[in-house]
Structures are given as C-alpha cells and as structure tokens.
Swiss-Prot record:
Keyword Nucleotide-binding: yes
Name this protein carries in UniProt: Flagellum site-determining protein YlxH
Record GO biological process: bacterial-type flagellum organization
Assembly notes: Interacts (via N-terminal region) with GTP-bound FlhF homodimer (via NG domain).
SUPFAM superfamilies to which the protein is assigned, alphabetical: P-loop containing nucleoside triphosphate hydrolases
Length: 298
C-alpha cells in the first residue's frame, strides 16, 4: 500500500525525533581515549589504570580518569578519598560531568564509580544521550581520558570499550587469568573484529615472565580467533604495591622510584608514544563511534 504525503512526513518526523534523542552534541575531540579491561577481577586493573594516569599527569598532561565500574568502583579507595559526586549522579541525576569531578594526587581529575547497584541497566535513552554529551564535552578539555571498566564485559560496557581508540587488557601470568583474558578478547572480536588491543601483564617477577605470559595468550588468540594483540608491557610484582593499597596511597606517589612505579611509567610511554599520528588518522572520534552504538540501541 502506497504511503500518502502525510504518512511520509510523519515517518520522517519520527525518524528525526529518534535521531535527536540518541545523538549527542559533538565537541571538537582533543583527548586520546583508552579503555582498560580485564577478564576477571583481582588482577590489579584499577590500580594500574590509576597509577598510569598519574604517570601521564606527572609528564604535564591533562588526564581524566573515569571509573566505569559502576557501583563497585575502586578509585576512591585506592586514593583514600570519599568523592562528593560519583558517576551514578551523572547517569541518574543528569549532573554535569565536569562539575562532578574529584581532584586526586598531582591534580588528577577523576570521577568515582560509586557504590551500590549497577544502575546502567536502568538508564533510558535520554540519559544515555545526556551522558554521551557530557563525555563529548570532557573529551575537548583533556589530553587523555582513561576508562577503568568493570571486570568482565557487560552489555552496557561494550559501547564504551569498542568506541575507545585503544583497549588495554590487564592480566597476570596465572593460567586462569590468561584464560579469562582470552575469553574477554573473544567476546570483543565477536562484536567488532577491527580493534586496537594491547596487553599488559601485571605481577611479573621479571620481564621474561611477562613476555612468556603474553606469548601464551597471543598464540591462543591468533590460533582460535585469527586476530593480533600487541604487547604493551609488564608491571613488576613489587611489595610496595600492597603496602600502598593498605595505606590508600597510589604506589606511584608513595614510591616514584619503586619497580612498579617505573613499570607503569614505561607502560604509559609505550601506550601513547606513537598515538599522536594514529589519532589524527582515525576516521571516527570516540563520540561518533559511541553515537552509532546509541542509534542501534534506540
């Protein structure tokens, strides 16, 4: 049956309204984005993300750390702070992101994941769009934005992970951690097979142990998934890390020359040393990619 002009106009309006609901305002993106993930909890993901952010901040960069482990965030605990606003306030109460940031050591800006239930499942499309708009604004204000994702991969975390320029997978030399990291990569490539994925191996006795663990993981990924991952580096198994956690002081602050601190400094340099050129060559910005996911959800 042929649509009359009235029906066509109504259909067009509906499509435009839907598009307006899901497309955020796009600011000029300045920041480079990194999503940090792990296959399971307990591998030191949040600790590495925090201290790597501090290493970048120490080099004079403007860094924003976003704790997207909603309701289970560790950044406040690791810093020894109690934030007045969390990501939950931004997501549920439409509080502006930049006004909700806390200030950590070395002037690091961050937003806590908060505590309580995961609220992302309760977000409607308008709240998603509001949050994306806030992120777009933040990306124009910082040099680097690091997303500390929750352990495992939930449906609501995927858009943020897949939209980032780089994905850093944290694992340890333990066989179970290696297998969990493989499962995380498999889940990602089944959704999107053109991703920039790098691996950092935590709690290594020496560089060789980190390289050996990466080699096992990389071989398995290549054999069964036919994709490549890159070695970002390893982080030394250092007693200063557990002491810093107990004292609620980032180990990069507590002991800047400790083995673990030197490791995250090298890791940060390795991750971002060549990103300037590649960042300019990217066809889509973080927000453009995220918007496409929002359109699919609508």
């Amino acid at each position: 049956m042929q649509m009359n002009r009235y029906d066509q106009a109504a259909t067009l309006r509906a499509k435009m309204e839907k598009r307006e609901r899901v497309l955020p305002m796009v600011y000029s993106q300045k920041a480079k984005t990194l999503a940090v993930i792990s296959g399971k909890g307990g591998v030191g993901k949040s600790n590495i993300t925090l201290n790597m952010a501090l290493a970048l901040q120490d080099k004079g960069k403007k860094v924003l750390l976003i704790d997207l482990d909603i309701g289970m965030g560790n950044i406040d605990i690791l810093i020894g702070n109690s934030s007045s606003a969390t990501i939950i306030d931004v997501l549920t109460d439409r509080k502006p992101l930049l006004q909700s940031l806390s200030v950590g050591p070395k002037g690091l800006r961050y937003i806590s994941g908060g505590t309580g239930l995961d609220v992302m499942f309760q977000l409607d499309q308008r709240k998603w769009t509001f949050f994306a708009n806030e992120l777009s604004h933040a990306l124009s204000q910082f040099d680097y934005v690091l997303f500390d994702m929750g352990a495992g991969l939930s449906k609501d975390q995927l858009p943020f992970i897949l939209s980032a320029e780089d994905i850093l997978i944290i694992t340890t030399p333990e066989p179970t951690a290696i297998m969990d990291a493989y499962s995380a990569v498999k889940h990602l490539v089944l959704t999107e097979n053109k991703l920039s994925m790098k691996v950092a191996v935590n709690r290594c006795r020496d560089q060789k142990e980190g390289l050996d663990a990466f080699a096992r993981l990389s071989r398995t990924i290549h054999m069964f998934l036919d994709v490549q991952v890159q070695f970002a580096g390893s982080v030394s198994d250092d007693v200063i890390v557990s002491k810093a956690v107990v004292e609620q002081v980032p180990f990069f602050i507590k002991s800047p020359q400790a083995k673990a601190s030197r490791s995250v400094r090298i890791l940060a340099d390795a991750l971002f040393e060549r990103e300037e050129t590649r960042h300019k060559e990217d066809k889509q910005t973080f927000i453009e990619k995220l918007s496409s996911f929002l359109m699919r959800r609508a």
